[in-house]
Amino acid sequence: MHHNRDVDLALVERPSSGYVYTTGWRLATTDIDEHQQLRLDGVARYIQEVGAEHLADAQLAEVHPHWIVLRTVIDVINPIELPSDITFHRWCAALSTRWCSMRVQLQGSAGGRIETEGFWICVNKDTLTPSRLTDDCIARFGSTTENHRLKWRPWLTGPNIDGTETPFPLRRTDIDPFEHVNNTIYWHGVHEILCQIPTLTAPYRAVLEYRSPIKSGEPLTIRYEQHDDVVRMHFVVGDDVRAAALLRRL
């Protein structure tokens, strides 16, 4: 099975200085699984909301309101369980003039820790093309990293999967303001497959990369295969791979 070593890279540690945004709230009962643990799709929603708060705190919400995520990495070190309050720390791990890698750390008050990183592109909503970050944005976000020459490099580049197929019907509630399937919805599919692999437990890593948008009404299927402790997934419309995911032990 094809293996890209980038998938094994450790996420950067939280810095001791610079602009680190901190917020928190109680773990919602709507975001837990049958074991009362925070699900992956819940993690994705939470880090998206923390990102929106972070932009508002930086007074950048109106300057750079539109972002598209190309990759999300979720490292479940220890599951966060109900009841728990969650503290979120968000900071920039690397950036360039049009995109950035943003780290979010989740810490549960009753134990549990989840580390995440997202590769976000600032976009023009009308053209859906990358938009240049303001100097103020670069200065504020760049205060937590020395890497100001970030480049996009996909991790999940293996061949098409011919494994098990699982239909994944879409709903109108899955559609975002760009008229595409919201990035957090894919994590419902990842969770569906994770539950079929009972031997894959924390600590583990989940990676999701988005290749091209999925629109309402398109027939979506998940194809997946398992080799030892690694599970590969493709979200396909016909034979067109729209997103790829990977699960592996840490």
Curated annotation (Swiss-Prot):
Gene3D superfamilies tied to this protein: Hotdog Thioesterase
Pfam short name (any one): Acyl-ACP_TE_C
Gene Ontology molecular function terms on file: fatty acyl-CoA hydrolase activity
Cystine pairs: none
GO biological process: fatty acid biosynthetic process
InterPro entries: 4-hydroxybenzoyl-CoA_TE (IPR050563), Acyl-ACP_TE_C (IPR049427), Acyl-ACP_thioesterase_NHD (IPR002864), HotDog_dom_sf (IPR029069)
Name of the molecule in the record: Uncharacterized protein MT2057
